[in-house]
């Protein structure tokens, strides 16, 4: 009995010693280099303005691409050209704002967003060759620009620049509203105010949009060729995120 107890004590001591030297790290084979932690990127006002430039440039490039402008009918071609000119002019104004806020102007399309959905838009437009897709795409892109500025308002630190972001967003929203009317004219999307009978419009009332102003959800647009027994491609276009900010 004593021998057994001694063996148990000795065994327990060995186990305790082994347990104390167990490596609880993740097992791996070979040498692994030490990884440097990612640096914290600062989303400065200049970075937001540079990103806005990249979005404006991207939209101008998409609308002026032959896959879009080349299939537009005569009326839409004039409209699209005017929108391209507006985005190009905006680049000049944004460039001055970037410089004033200590940044370097960025006159290139947003590469991350082009990979995410811009290239798909051009590919689908080239495959579909539908003139009827030009104005809906224009409306979607203008809505994207408006949502981008609205999102950036909350991130802008300079109060004067924040007000300018609001103005830029309002201008983009007006262009989106014009494009929407070109796609489907009328007042179907407006909320009307009526008398108690529910049919007579209230005198002096002003029609308003029923939904909340400036949604920030992804903008959707249907593009591409017709597919037998299947819906056409639906492209989701979202505003810039932290990995698509031009720092």
Residue locations for each model-derived region?
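N-terminal export signals
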Residues: 1-20
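All-alpha RGS (Regulator of G-protein Signaling) helical domain and cognate RGS-like helical scaffolds
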Residues: 7, 21-247
